[in-house]
Amino acid sequence: MARKKVALDFEQSLADLQTLVERLENGELSLEDSLTAFEQGIGLTRDCQSALAQAEQKVQVLLERDGELAEEPFDAEQPE
């Protein structure tokens, strides 16, 4: 269940980031609101980058074989 929560948190952070970008690109925010949105966006970006880095580490651990790391490219189309 924790894995789903992390995935949902990542997806929500990504959606929130997209919303902030759209608001900033729209150009209707005041300078103060733009700076606040920018700060929030930086935080969301860091959260997303951290979640992606953790996921990458988990994939590398799962691919570990015979005490050596066998890095393989991720292929979403590859059957399990």
UniProtKB/Swiss-Prot annotation:
GO cellular component: cytosol; exodeoxyribonuclease VII complex
Gene Ontology process terms (BP): DNA catabolic process
Stored Pfam families: Exonuc_VII_S
GO molecular function: exodeoxyribonuclease VII activity
Cystine crosslinks: none
Keywords: Cytoplasm, Exonuclease, Hydrolase, Nuclease
Catalytic activity: Exonucleolytic cleavage in either 5'- to 3'- or 3'- to 5'-direction to yield nucleoside 5'-phosphates
Protein EC: 3.1.11.6
Predominant place of localization: cytoplasm
Subcellular location(s) per record: Cytoplasm
Subunit structure: Heterooligomer composed of large and small subunits.
Annotated family: Belongs to the XseB family.
PANTHER family: EXODEOXYRIBONUCLEASE 7 SMALL SUBUNIT (PTHR34137:SF1)
Function according to Swiss-Prot or TrEMBL: Bidirectionally degrades single-stranded DNA into large acid-insoluble oligonucleotides, which are then degraded further into small acid-soluble oligonucleotides.
Protein's recorded name: Exodeoxyribonuclease 7 small subunit
Gene: xseB
